[in-house]
Amino acid sequence: MDVSWDADNFEPKLPTTLAASNKWEGEDEDDNVKESWEDEEEEKKDEEKTEAAPPPQPKPKKKIHDKIAERERQEREKAERLVTEKTAEEMTPEQKLAEKLRQQKLQEESDLRLAMETFGVTEGNIGKLDNFHPTTKEEYTEFADLLTKKITFYKAKDEFPGFIDDLVKNILVQMSSADIRRIKLTVDNLYIEKQKAEKNDKTKKATKGKGKAKLKLEGDNAHLNQYESYGNFDDDYDDFI
């Protein structure tokens, strides 16, 4: 039925194919191309970052035999410790005393080695002393110095005075009476000077800042002054003369 253009209720129909976009033709394509380029650039940057970052280094792992050796060492130390503790518990009083003395001896030997190093008495000097065969006066002086260091190293021992007594007698008995008389005069002179030094030391003992009085020998006995630093001789030298 034909519709009249003059009808009051006439409404014209708009074409349905009209696009709602306000953009010009081809404008949407430009936007899509631009977005595509930006995406590609971002992907390239991500790839470069991924390539630049070094892969994390794996932690070094112990080899199987190293782990086994370490475990065996720990178990062995633990077993030795348990045996030592158990042995100490099972020891008799006599065994404990013997072990204590053994440990004490080891400590004394360690202290002795330390003291020898402190006083300059080394194994090299001891070996030199054993192989020393003096022939000249200078060599005998060096020989006396080595002997003095070796002997006076034990001066703090209670047995030291008796040892010196026996040593001097065993040496003098092989000498002539003239030599013994000359040595006796030297010892007498040393005895007198030693008494004076000890007497002066007693009078100055209360004074602070002053050292112990030292004897000083002159004349033929002046060479004995160098041995004063090695220790004090006993006052009983005149008993065996």
Curated annotation (Swiss-Prot):
It comes from the Eukaryota. Pfam families: eIF3_subunit. Component of the eukaryotic translation initiation factor 3 (eIF-3) complex. PANTHER family: EUKARYOTIC TRANSLATION INITIATION FACTOR 3 SUBUNIT J. InterPro entries: eIF3-like_dom_sf, eIF3j. Component of the eukaryotic translation initiation factor 3 (eIF-3) complex, which is involved in protein synthesis of a specialized repertoire of mRNAs and, together with other initiation factors, stimulates binding of mRNA and methionyl-tRNAi to the 40S ribosome. The eIF-3 complex specifically targets and initiates translation of a subset of mRNAs involved in cell proliferation. It is found in: Cytoplasm. Gene3D superfamilies: Eukaryotic translation initiation factor 3 like domains. Disulfide bonds: none annotated. This is Eukaryotic translation initiation factor 3 subunit J. Residues 61-118 form a coiled coil. GO terms for molecular function: translation initiation factor activity. One of its GO terms (biological process) is formation of cytoplasmic translation initiation complex. GO terms for cellular component: eukaryotic 43S preinitiation complex; eukaryotic 48S preinitiation complex; eukaryotic translation initiation factor 3 complex. It comes from Bombyx mori (Silk moth). The keyword Metal-binding does not apply. Keywords: Coiled coil, Cytoplasm, Initiation factor, Protein biosynthesis. Its main location: cytoplasm. Residues 1-94 are annotated as: Disordered. Residues 26-45 have a biased composition (Acidic residues). Belongs to the eIF-3 subunit J family. Residues 66-89 have a biased composition (Basic and acidic residues).
